[in-house]
From Swiss-Prot:
Protein name from the UniProt record: DNA-directed RNA polymerase subunit omega
InterPro entries, A to Z: DNA-dir_RNA_pol_omega, Pol_omega/Rpo6/RPB6, RPB6/omega-like_sf
Organism: Picosynechococcus sp. (strain ATCC 27264 / PCC 7002 / PR-6)
Family stated for the protein in its record: Belongs to the RNA polymerase subunit omega family.
Encoding gene per record: rpoZ
NCBIfam families linked: PRK00392.2-5
GO terms under biological process: DNA-templated transcription
Role this protein plays: Promotes RNA polymerase assembly. Latches the N- and C-terminal regions of the beta' subunit thereby facilitating its interaction with the beta and alpha subunits.
SUPFAM superfamilies registered for this protein in UniProt: RPB6/omega subunit-like (SSF63562)
Catalytic reaction list: RNA(n) + a ribonucleoside 5'-triphosphate = RNA(n+1) + diphosphate
Transcription recorded as keyword: yes
EC number, UniProt record: 2.7.7.6
Amino acid sequence: MQKRSSFDSAEIMHRAEDLMQAASNRYRITVQVAQRAKRRRYEEFDAVEDPLMKPPIRAIIEMSDELTQPEIIGE
């Protein structure tokens, strides 16, 4: 039995590419994605929304959304 994921791997790759192109330093953006994934993993340890979507994938999606839609960042 094959599990169906709720995301498209090609879309994830495209979003990751967009993040890399927008960043001035590839290493720094990679570290930022990793830090966000780690933080989200511990923040939502008990509340599991989508067990198929791993924290790094969720971090890439969130960061690319923030890049393309700056109005979603509310401070």
